[in-house]
Structures are given as C-alpha cells and as structure tokens.
C-alpha cells in the first residue's frame, strides 16, 4: 500500500475507539482501499454496534441527530455542539433488551443496537451520554464511580457490511460479543 491514511496504518480504512471491541476493515491494496473508503464516504457501509448503557429507554427506537465537535472544556474529549458548529453526526438506536435495577447492579440497564449514518470520533459514546444513557465501562463519557470500570467499555462493533471491491458482491460480517460482555449480560438476566 502506498501509505494511504498514513504510513503507520497501512490498509486501515476506518477506526474504532480504543476500548471498543469488534470488526474493522483492512485492505490489502490501494484499489481496494480507495473503493472501501469511497463506500464509507457515501455511507453505503453497514456498521452496527451493540452497546450496554445505563438507564432504561422509554421508547424502543430512535435517532440522535446532533453535531459533534471537540469539547471546549477538554480538547481530548468530543461533545455535542450547536447545529451551526462541529460536524454532522447521526446515530440510530434500537432497544434489544431492558434490565431492571439488580441486586449487584443498582441502576437499570439497556442493551441497544446502534447504527451509524456518520462515523465521528466517539460518536456513539457522546450521543448516548447526551441523551442520558452513558455506556457502561466508559471512563470518559460515562458515569462517575462506574461499577463496570476496568473491564473496558461495553461497545462492540458487531456487524460490518460492504460491497467487495473486486467482485461487486455485497458482503456482511459479524463478530460475537467478547466474554466479559456476555458474562455481564448473563448476570443482568439472572
């Protein structure tokens, strides 16, 4: 590869946050990289994430359409900003399961699937926190004294779909939840 996207990341088309688990796309040559990057720009790549968030939703699905930019208070963080600032960011969410407050976990939790129209830095984490549902284990945008701290944030890139650069075939891949995520869900269901 000719160093597209930087010499330190040959073939990597997009990123996921440091403590997010799951799928990313890596390309083996420039042609594939350019094709996949174009699909990403056209929003034709399917990206679905599974997240465990605090508090229960009172709706089964919805959309967060709120611009994101660097936080004025802390430049290492992102934040929702007024519509005339930052960059467009759209996250669709669907409730997969709701968990009431539990003997071990004192706060109600919700398992959601998030689908991105855009792919801004920390987008799901910022949007979920913005609407009152911070991610479990997220020490940046989450709640203080998070009972899941130290295990990693509960955000998993579960599904990636795209058109193959050479064959034109639509392909979709999925990755199972990591063990710590599955174990927590079992405890919440008990």
Predicted regions and their residues:
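RNA pseudouridine synthases
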Residues: 1-190
């Amino acid at each position: 590869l000719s160093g597209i996207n930087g010499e330190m990341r040959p073939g990597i088309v997009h990123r996921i946050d440091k403590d997010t688990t799951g799928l990313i796309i890596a390309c083996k040559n420039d042609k594939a990289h350019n094709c996949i990057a174009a699909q990403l720009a056209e929003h034709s790549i399917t990206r679905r994430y599974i997240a465990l968030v605090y508090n229960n939703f009172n709706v089964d699905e919805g959309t967060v359409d709120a611009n994101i930019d660097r936080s004025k208070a802390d430049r290492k963080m992102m934040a929702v900003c007024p519509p005339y600032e930052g960059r467009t960011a759209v996250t669709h969410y669907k409730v997969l399961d709701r968990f009431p407050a539990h003997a071990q976990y004192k706060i109600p939790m919700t398992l959601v699937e998030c689908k991105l129209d855009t792919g801004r830095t920390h987008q799901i984490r910022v949007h979920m926190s913005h609407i009152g549902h911070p991610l479990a284990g997220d020490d940046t945008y989450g709640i203080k004294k998070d009972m899941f701290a130290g295990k990693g944030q509960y955000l998993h890139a579960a599904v990636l779909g795209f058109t193959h650069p050479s064959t034109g075939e639509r392909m979709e891949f999925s990755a199972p939840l990591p063990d710590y995520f599955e174990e927590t869900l079992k405890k919440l269901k008990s």
